[in-house]
A protein has these predicted regions:
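Mobile active-site "lid"/loop adjacent to the S-adenosyl-L-methionine
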Residues: 39-69
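Alpha/beta-hydrolase-fold catalytic nucleophile elbow
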Residues: 36, 55, 91
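Residue-level signal for inorganic ion chemistry
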Residues: 2, 36, 52, 74, ...
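Flexible, glycine-/basic-rich loop-and-beta segments that form/coincide
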Residues: 128-137
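Helix-to-beta-strand junctions that scaffold the AdoMet/dcAdoMet cofactor pocket
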Residues: 11, 56, 81-84
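Conserved SAM/SAH cofactor-binding pocket of Class I
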Residues: 1-47
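Conserved Class I SAM-dependent methyltransferase catalytic core
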Residues: 65-129
Length: 137
């Protein structure tokens, strides 16, 4: 877990970890938000392996029609939670990098790095909030 990793890295004393429902997350001023929202398009759920479907609840998988519903929500909500120059680390699904990056930019973020999986697909975007913008639906 993130807490265990922070203890191993001797960062626990200066870190706070919260696992919350995005809708109940209060406005605050955070330095970093890490999110792994559901990002699988609804139409693709039926094609997932049984190992995934039997292990994960549907709410942890289904990202809506294009898989971006909760990604958009995290970006919008984090815009009100992060300090200026705060960082957002956001996991994205296969082939969602460009669309997620566009939404981030529109909402006042600048991407500073991307992390790829073993197949060289971008799976995580790390960005910095540089200004406040309205949410693009």
């Amino acid at each position: 877990t993130a807490e265990a990793n922070s203890k191993n890295l001797k960062l626990f004393y200066r870190s706070k970890f919260k696992v919350v429902d995005l809708d109940k997350f209060n406005i605050g001023k955070y330095d970093l938000i890490v999110s792994n929202p559901p990002y699988i398009p609804s139409r693709d759920i039926k094609n997932l392996s049984k190992d995934i479907i039997n292990y994960e609840p549907l709410t942890a998988l289904d990202g809506g029609v294009d898989g971006l519903d909760l990604i958009k929500k995290v970006i919008y909500k984090s815009n009100h939670l992060l300090k200026r120059m705060g960082m957002l680390a956001l996991e994205v699904g296969h082939n969602q990098y460009r669309r997620a990056l566009s939404i981030l930019r529109y909402n006042g973020y600048r991407a500073i790095s991307k992390e790829c999986d073993y197949n060289r697909n971008v799976r995580c975007i790390i960005s910095t909030k540089v200004s406040f913008f309205k949410f693009k639906k």
